[in-house]
Amino acid sequence: MSHPDLLAPPDTRPIEVGEVWENPVTLESAVTVDLPWLNDEGRAAGIMTAVPGARVVGEHMHPALVERFSVEDGELTVLLDGRKSVLGAGERAEIQPGVWHDWWNEGDKTAIVRVEVTPGERFGHLIETLFGLAREGHVNKRGMPHPLQLALLATEFSDIIVFRKPPPAVQRPLFGILAPLARRRGYRATYPSLSRTTLAPRVPRDTPAG
């Protein structure tokens, strides 16, 4: 697991409704249906397809955002604050800031789930980075980046996500030690060739996407 090419040209295509974002390692796929600059709440939303065996990269919590799952078809197993439940079609879960959670599809049918995140812009930047690293082969079989990459990513997005392992009390000093080494070895928190969310033009509200 090396790092992406730092000399690769940036991807500055506009981010639009209807895009498909895929992670070939965690088997997540989502179609964007709302973008933070298109609504007053700053919400990002997508329709996620989770095939059997799909799962998020690991148990985590969001310090300052709300995440909502609405199952449209199939079933999604959710671990919410240590309690496991299975959401079926028509059922929802709302995850408040600071609540540890995880999800996966342990059934034999593809799950279709609407996912909403508020506020969503920096969350989108994180997801585009993680998915891009996965597509280029820079993650392990669980979808987690190299520890040097993770040190920079977790520090940059500490307001968005905190992974449960290693424990947060260990992460802070550990990542503080690893971050300078990671930069010297060419790692960056994000990469313009993978993450358009900070550079791409915004499609105005009154301009049809696509």
Please give the residue ranges for each predicted region.
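Jelly-roll (double-stranded beta-helix
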Residues: 1-28, 35-43, 54-59, 63-65, ...
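Short, well-ordered beta-strand segments enriched in hydrophobic/aromatic residues
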Residues: 44-50
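Structured binding elements
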Residues: 69
